Regions:
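Short hydrophobic targeting helices and cationic amphipathic motifs
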Residues: 6, 12-14, 29, 46, ...
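Intrinsic disorder/low-complexity segments
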Residues: 26, 42-44
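Residue-identity detector for glycine
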Residues: 30, 34, 38-41
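Substrate/ligand-engaging "lid" and interaction regions
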Residues: 71-557
Length: 557
């Protein structure tokens, strides 16, 4: 039996009556002896091999781990600088499965849900995280050893950071360790929503045709072996099949990835896979599964070992899986949930009948600006977004891109002030506390460019608009991929897994025009536009001869 004691908005899980009485005695002692270990600033977690373990707190300049026997010790300590979750976690049940438990999910959906669970009427909406990839093992192991709890540090633009203890991730399953548990969980009657962060390229959609790619080896394996899936499509299909056969009711699949019309993309991917595998299930999905579109926004950097040390030192805890993010957050969702949903609007989520205008604004301004900045800034020797944006040349370049190139194609949604939105973007990019990595923005360009850059570039070409900045971006992307050395002589590795072997042949071609046939550009024949080609060829040569900064200065004139 776990007793939960609420003290100064903190929850203490005490395993038995003896420990509960010990806690009460320490409360009395605390009146006379000051701060007692285990009373203030300490969170107790039940663990498999320990009666309980405490989150560490900072004691002067060193970190102390508290074990159960130290409750008898009187010490002076500063409180851990973390706001605990404001609910009894033992009362939370799981109503959401999330596939792809990365940093963004833990800073975004979990953040909203963690707040919402303080409402007793919403406590059926805890989250079960599902990891499916081999690379997920380290994060899975780190979270499991601390009962899926972690700290989220929100970094303010005013240099004030606030750390939260996140308790909404009630369960965590690693598909490579227990695939049957994944299928069973998706089929469970209490699960009403499957949310996804599987990256822009994870939906396996051909960029040119817009069709789901059935021919990949992993997809072919899952089509032929429905009971032993390897892909997200196979796992979801297996779970839905089990759900259908057990008559466990409808369910919503909600994409939280940076894709325009991400719900439509998710529907295309999953329904195409299921139609190729199981016609009966395909019919069931058509009437029992909805795919709302959504727009998500919160800059969440990759976490390095140095970040872990820094965050834990600042927060006074020992967290093996901390995450940090900016203070801006937004989530806009089409209200199309067939099996019910959390009242996320109580904690700031916006619901609408059509998310398109919000998607277009965010993808065209924020995400496109990230890509426009990433390659030239990295080639100039910068490694962090905030450092690059504090270079007035790059800030001006982004401002011109947003104002001149993009704003004509972005109608403001709702009551949004686009001028203020763009100013806020530059402030967010320059947030010194976040220090997002340019390498993260450079990665996976082949799946980002068709979504963030190409839709507006196509319109710009049709309108015979000024193409200098997008030509500069294209030339910088080629230089980044082809030479893999920045202007300061630093060698780097490229992480762009969606580039094909044919793409790499074209990248290595000495003729720069071959690059314009790359798969990310297939939605429009760039080679046919004389103005774009002229600008692009001039900039390719200039980047090689003069370097990014000197070329950028000519563009800004």
């Amino acid at each position: 039996m776990i007793r939960t004691v609420l003290h100064k908005n903190r929850n203490y899980n005490l395993p038995n009556k003896q420990e509960y009485e010990k806690w009460e005695r320490l409360q009395i002692l605390g009146t006379f002896a000051g701060t007692i270990a285990g009373i203030s600033g300490i969170k107790i977690y039940p663990k498999k091999n320990h009666p309980f373990t405490f989150v560490s707190v900072k004691h002067k300049t060193r970190i102390i781990k508290f074990k159960s026997d130290i409750m008898k010790t009187l010490i002076q300590h500063q409180h851990a600088n973390v706001i605990p979750f404001p609910y009894d976690r033992s009362c939370i049940t799981t109503g959401i499965v999330h596939i792809g438990v990365g940093n963004f999910h833990r800073a975004h959906e979990e953040y909203y849900t963690n707040q919402l669970l303080s409402d007793p009427s919403q406590q059926k909406w805890g989250i079960c995280g599902i990891a499916l990839l081999a690379g997920d093992k380290s994060l899975y192991s780190a979270l499991k050893q601390q009962d899926n709890l972690y700290t989220l540090t929100v970094c303010g633009r005013d240099n004030r950071d606030i750390a939260y203890e996140i308790g909404s991730l009630k369960e965590l399953i690693w598909g490579m360790e227990n695939p049957d548990a994944v299928i069973h969980k998706i089929a469970h009657p209490e699960i009403k929503i499957i949310t996804l962060t599987i990256t822009e390229g994870g939906y396996n959609i051909d960029k040119a045709s817009g069709n789901f790619i059935l021919e990949t080896p992993a997809v072919q394996h899952d089509l032929k072996n429905p009971d032993t899936p390897q892909t997200v499509f196979g796992f979801v299909a297996a779970g839905l099949r089990k759900r259908m056969k057990a008559h466990q009711g409808p369910i919503t699949i909600l994409s939280c990835d940076n894709l325009q019309h991400n719900g439509n993309t998710a529907r295309k991917a999953f329904c195409s896979f299921i139609a190729a595998q199981d016609s009966e299930l395909a019919d069931w999905v058509n009437t029992n599964v909805t795919f709302p579109n959504s727009m998500v926004d919160r800059i969440t950097p990759a976490v390095t070992p140095a970040d872990i040390e820094r965050l834990n030192r600042h927060n006074g805890v020992e967290d093996a899986a901390p995450v940090y993010c900016e203070d801006f957050i937004q989530w806009v969702i089409e209200d199309n949930f067939i099996a019910g949903r959390p009242d996320w609007e109580k904690v700031g989520v916006e619901f609408t009948t059509d998310v398109s205008a919000y998607e277009n604004m965010k993808l065209s301004l924020l995400n496109a600006s990230h890509s426009m900045l990433a390659y030239p800034a990295f080639l100039a020797g910068y490694r962090k977004v905030d450092d690059a944006v504090h270079d007035k040349r790059f800030a001006r370049y982004l401002q011109q891109f947003m104002d001149t190139d993009i704003t004509p194609y972005v109608p403001a949604p709702g009551h949004t002030d686009l001028t203020q939105y763009k100013q806020t973007l530059l402030e967010r990019f320059g947030n010194r506390s976040v220090s997002d990595q340019l390498s993260r923005l450079c990665s996976d360009g082949a799946s980002k460019i068709p979504v963030y850059i190409m839709p507006n570039l196509i319109q710009m070409i049709r309108d015979k608009a000024d193409l200098r900045r997008v030509s500069f971006f294209t030339a910088a992307y080629r230089h980044y991929l082809k030479y893999q050395q920045d202007d300061k002589g630093n060698i780097y590795e490229v992480n762009d897994p969606w580039l094909t072997e044919t793409d790499w042949i074209q990248i290595r071609e000495e003729n720069p025009l071959a690059f314009l046939a790359l798969s990310p550009f297939k939605s429009t024949p760039l080679q046919r536009d004389e103005g774009f080609v002229t600008n692009y060829l001039q900039l390719v040569s200039a980047l090689k001869e003069k370097g990014v900064v000197e070329v950028l200065e000519t563009i800004l004139q």
